Amino acid sequence: MQKWAKTSAATQQFGVLLFDGFSTHCLANTIEPLRAANTLSGKTLYIWEFLTLDGQIAESSSGMQVTPHRELSAAKGDVLAVMPSYGFEGHAGWVTQMALRSASHRFESLAGLDTGSWLFAEAELLDGYQATI
């Protein structure tokens, strides 16, 4: 098997912001490629942590519960992946907007997964950019 990992690449820190109703399928499809890259390279290329707005357990649409490592306000990193999924409209209030705006200064890149781009739009983080929602 060919080794494609960059030897000088810094470990990338991913924060995965979960909301109640998130898709376990979307979560697995986000984390598994990172885990596989680590395994195949024999290096820690990616690390990730699960986040919620309030530090409380998030429950997926299928009933799986995920205990976050910390709340969003205490997190920083390279990529923030926002994963609301079903019922995202219920998460689109000012608390979420302020939290996402604040987090945009602590993360290098933002990724809206599933319906996450809607929350970025509500927080005005897509203003001035072309985006698909």
How would you describe each model-predicted region?
Residues 125-133:
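A short alpha->loop->secondary-structure connector
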Residues 110-111, 132:
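Structural detector of well-ordered beta-strand residues that form the stable sheet scaffold
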Residues 1-110, 118-124:
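Extended, subdomain-level signal for the structured scaffold at the beginning of enzyme domains
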Residues 114:
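Catalytic, metal-anchored helix/loop core of enzyme active sites in primary metabolism
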